[in-house]
A protein has these predicted regions:
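Periplasmic-binding protein-like
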Residues: 167-170, 229-234, 238-241, 245, ...
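Short, polar/charged alpha-helical segment
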Residues: 29-39, 52-63, 73-94, 172
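Boundary at the C-terminal end of the N-terminal hydrophobic targeting segment
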Residues: 19-25
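Mature extracytoplasmic/periplasmic domains
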Residues: 286, 290-355
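Extracytoplasmic ligand-binding site segments that recognize negatively charged/polar headgroups
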Residues: 69-84, 96-112, 118-255
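Bacterial N-terminal signal peptides
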Residues: 8-18
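A ligand-binding cleft/hinge motif common to bilobed small-molecule-binding domains
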Residues: 129-133, 257-276
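Extracellular/periplasmic bilobal clamshell ligand-binding domains
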Residues: 334-383
């Protein structure tokens, strides 16, 4: 009888242990859906609990703060979908999201801060303004986030004041009805030396800092000047007023054979709609980082920490990819399945733009040369 009681008790303990384990590992419904939709190995989420293990004081503080104000570039619908697991995990934090353009995310917030007004708690994609925030010592140190060490040191600020939450490739979109794969340039020099891309077949947008600046930094100013002159003088590209996304749409419509630069996630969206769009990266592959940062004077510091830490966790990274094809920066997720058009990116030499170039003499020289061509009727004559 005693043996039977012991067996029953042992079995009950085992069942309770299993239930407890299942409860601890249970994922938000939106996360489960994302893993299923992307056909991912659930083991990729191993370690998530440790990444989200924040101090109790942060949780208690966030409950008192009740909200966090976030500025970014996502469409409101995308942001709502992307952050569903966060809201399930932290229902006591209201996410107030404000979609803003470059100036809104950058200088407007900084000017307001200098006037004693705090407009947001968390900002994303502030590359063009990050140096000004650094000079003003306006950003909080994020080293204390459990997720800080998830990210390669190449993708975080040396002083810990920002972390990358995604990578962006700045390559070429092309029309697959008009361009064959074998005609695509292997290097950037191949592009400007191939007449097939001349006579208006290439559309340029006025965003040289997104792709060309990193190449100037990689190869030097002598190469950069020669390449820039060849780009305009040899190819005579269409100089378009549209933004990156709209120009990619014009490629799909057949307005020109290719556009430069084009974000990989925009091209991927057109492909999923059945448009005749491909994506190609000459070597080296230009990469820009999208930062996420917290204002040091944030009135919702604990809620802001929770949000940023979640964004760079395995779960946050996978949800960004599932929602808008964002490429993860998490060390454990550097896998081809997370890279749109992996066949033209994975295995190639890459060049991550050093954002210090944005306030460098190199950028000044590149911009002056670029603008001299961009604003001229037919481009300046060679010196």
């Amino acid at each position: 009888m005693l043996r039977r009681i012991l067996l029953i008790a042992t079995g009950l303990v085992s069942v309770l242990a299993l239930l407890s384990s299942a409860g601890a590992a249970e994922l938000p419904k939106a996360t489960q859906k994302a893993v299923a939709d992307l056909k991912l190995d659930p083991a990729l989420l191993n370690g998530l609990d440790a990444e989200l293990d924040v101090p109790k004081a942060w949780l208690d503080g966030a409950r008192q703060e009740k909200e966090v104000i976030i500025s970014g570039t996502w469409e409101p619908r995308e942001f709502q979908q992307m952050t569903a697991p966060f809201r399930e995990r932290y229902p006591f934090v209201n996410l107030r999201y404000e979609r803003a353009g470059t100036s809104g995310r950058g200088m407007q917030v900084l000017v307001a801060l200098q006037e004693g007004r705090v407009l947001v708690d968390v900002m994303t994609s502030i590359a063009d303004a990050v140096s000004y925030y650094t000079q003003a010592k306006a950003l909080a140190d994020l080293h204390d986030l459990p997720g800080f060490n998830n990210i390669s040191k190449d993708y975080v600020a040396a002083d810990g004041t920002w972390i990358s939450h995604k990578l962006s490739f700045r390559c070429m979109a092309y029309n697959t009805d008009k361009v064959k794969k074998e005609a695509l340039p292997k290097t950037w020099d191949d592009l400007v030396n191939d007449p097939r891309w001349g006579n208006g077949n290439l559309g340029l947008t006025n965003n040289p800092s997104a792709w060309l600046l990193g190449l100037w930094g990689e190869f030097g100013e002598t190469w950069g000047e020669k390449f820039t002159r060849s780009l305009f003088e040899k190819l005579q590209p269409q100089r378009r007023k549209e933004g990156l996304s709209a120009a990619t749409g014009l490629v799909a419509a057949g307005e020109f054979n290719g556009s430069l630069p084009s974000p990989e996630w925009v091209a991927k969206r057109y492909v999923t709609k059945g448009a005749p769009v491909g994506y190609h990266c000459p070597e080296p592959v230009p990469i820009t980082l999208s930062q996420i940062a917290m204002l040091d004077k944030s009135p919702h510091r604990n809620a802001a920490r929770l949000f940023i830490n979640w964004m760079v966790s395995r779960e946050g990274q996978i949800l960004q990819n599932a929602t808008s094809f964002d490429v993860p920066v998490h060390k454990a997720l550097q896998l081809p399945e997370f890279v749109p058009f992996a066949d033209t990116i994975v295995g190639k030499r890459k060049k991550v733009r050093d954002d210090a170039l944005l306030v460098s003499d190199t950028n000044k020289k590149m911009t002056e040369l670029w603008d001299s061509y961009w604003t001229a009727a037919a481009g300046p004559k060679k010196p």
